[in-house]
Amino acid sequence: LPDGPGWFYPPTVIADVPTEARVCREEIFGPVAPVTSFATDDEALELANDTEFGLIAYAYTRDLDRALAVAEGLESGMVGLNAGVISNPAAPFGGVKASGFGREGGREGIEEYLEVKYVGIAH
């Protein structure tokens, strides 16, 4: 940890991280960005999805069609496109795989608190 009071850890980018590294295999709830290279979008998706977790994923590109295709292929509950902070009270929040099931917030999140009743009537 850095010197100084408290538990502050400065934002850190780690380049050329091997895909089998622990930092690429676990959820890191801190300001750390492991960066690895890829040759094709398919390879990038394969690398990104090769984890048991899936809370949020990020993609950065100038090509909107490419960004949307990558977002569709990512196995995560949320995707940030060209944005690091995407939380919004009106949006559903939640992950997939070992990162959770269900959603909080947004219209989808309220469903957990509602009772649905079906009434069938013969006439």
Predicted features and spans:
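Conserved C-terminal structural/oligomerization subdomain of aldehyde/semialdehyde dehydrogenase
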Residues: G4, F8-H123
